[in-house]
Each structure stands twice: as C-alpha cells, then as structure tokens.
Amino acid sequence: LPEEVRAAEKLTLPPWGMLTGVRPDKPVTWALMEGKTPEEAKNYLKEHYFVPEDRAALALDCAQASLRAKRSLREDEVSLYIGIPFCPTRCAYCSFVSQAVEKSFALMEPYLEVLLGEITQAAQMVKDLGLNVKSFYMGGGTPTTLSAGQMDRLLTHLNQSFDLSRCAEYCIEAGRPDTIDREKLQVLLDHGCDRISVNPQSLEDSVLRAIGRRHTAADIEKTMALAMSMGFRHVNMDLIAGLPADTPEGFRRTLDKCLSFGADNITVHTLALKKGSRILLEGQKIPTAEEVGQMLDYSISALRGANFHP
C-alpha cells in the first residue's frame, strides 16, 4: 500500500486493526496449523488485518499456548463442567442464567438434588464410553453461594461418581468474597480442589458499587490473604476492563493490587455489553474505547513485566 495510506491507518485503525467478530488469535492459530512459521503467522495478522506489532505478538503467544494445550489432550479425555446458577446479587454487566439468592433461596436445595442425579447419569455415560476426565470446572453464577454442607455433599457425590485419577485440574470458581469463608475453602481442599478463581472484577469501591456488588475492596484483600494461606496450588483472579465508574488510573491500581496478592493467574476481560445486562438496559455510562485501550495496554505491559504469560 502507498505510504500515505499506511500513515492514515496508524491514525484511524483500532488496536486490533481490521479484525472484527473473531478472536484475534484465531487467524494466527489457523496459519500455524497450515504449517506457517510463528513469524509468518504473526506477519499474516499484521499484513492482512493491519494489527500492530504488540497485539500481533500477543495473539501469537495465545495461539501457541492454545495449540500446546490441544496437543496435550488425548481422544479419550473430556472436560467436566458444573454450573451453579445462584449469586448473592446480580452484577450489572451479567446476562448469564443466574438468580440472586434473596429471590431464589428456596430453589437451591431442589436444584442441588436434581444436579446430584445428573452427575450420576453423566458419570455412567463417561464410563460407558470409556472416557476419562481431564479437567473439572465448577462455575456459575457463584458456586460458593452454596453452604459448606451443600458443597460437601456435591463434591462427595462428584468424587464418588467419576474417576478423577487423570484429572489434571480441579477448579472451582469461588467468585465473590461475600460468599467465601475458611470452612468452605477447607471443604474444597478436602475434596481435591487445587485451583480456585476469586473474581473481584475491580478493587475500586466506587466501581464495585456501580456494578451492584455488596462487598468492598478490603473484603477482597482479606479473602485473598485467607485463600493464599490455605495452600491452594493455583489462585486466579478475574478483572474486567471498561466497567462503569472505572478509569485507567483506577484499573491500574486494581491490577497492581492483584499482583501484590500473589495470584499466579490473572485474567483480564473487556466489558461486553450483553442484551440482558442492567448496564445496557439502564444506559449506564462506561469508559470510552480509548480509556479501555489504556487499561489493556497497561495489562499487557504489567503482566509481562511480572513474568505472566498467556
């Protein structure tokens, strides 16, 4: 392309160039699977979609990591997911199938009973097909909305129903600090859970209030200290860039605090405006695309600087 056109692109293109409606690592993954070298795959993203070098390098790292994970899988291995569709409150950005406990507490016990039956059926199916569970993840909702006793019943039945001897990762989304205590965490450890995910989304109290959370940043700090002291092998923290009331400076403070807690996984999402979310329905003001870009730029540099990799 003429030099003038390329100069104009630098001024007008968004951070991921012309990529729209596709995960940025997908074209790179396809290129690698077709036999291109990593450098060729990265250049394909730059030349065909005008993705800048830093984002193209990140997409390449993600693609290589996903292909390594895929190569480690065997044909007789499956992943197991259990969903617990209850939360203390419904977050403003949420569109998942989930209910606030205050409105649906009476449904929790019947749901658990039906779930135990489904676990029995699924375990028999896995056994009949000669399959092995490679990984287990419990999400939601917020699984730790269950009481310690309910969680104990659920995990006892799970471990008795499935052969988890080849399970490489046993992860439960602990989610929100207002649902986590020592007793529940001990139940998770006792049943073999080696990875939990604590999801503050932000450590700015103004942002937590804006998204409908009933806990504070100080609560998250206490929960992380407790979780880290109890010996979980891996602890993940989820953050969202672009939440109402957040700023690039506030997001930087959040990420820096997460790094100081010692979590060995940090997942940074960008806010997606979903049709059923309160943010969209109420027209809440959110950060600009430029501000979100600053949050993501800092995420890349700070996490790489702390030796985190995709």
Where do the protein language model's features map onto the residues?
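Short, well-ordered secondary-structure micro-motifs within conserved domains or adaptor modules
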Residues: L1-E3
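N-terminal [4Fe-4S]-dependent radical SAM core
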Residues: V5-L13, M33-L80, L129-G130
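C-terminal accessory regions of radical SAM enzymes
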Residues: P14, V22-P24, L296-P310
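Short, polar/flexible loop-turn hinges at active-site or ligand-entry regions and domain interfaces
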Residues: L11-P15, V101-S104
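Canonical Radical SAM [4Fe-4S] cluster-binding loop centered on the CxxxCxxC motif
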Residues: E77-Y111
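Conserved non-cysteine loop/helix-boundary elements of the Radical SAM core domain that shape
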Residues: S98-S299
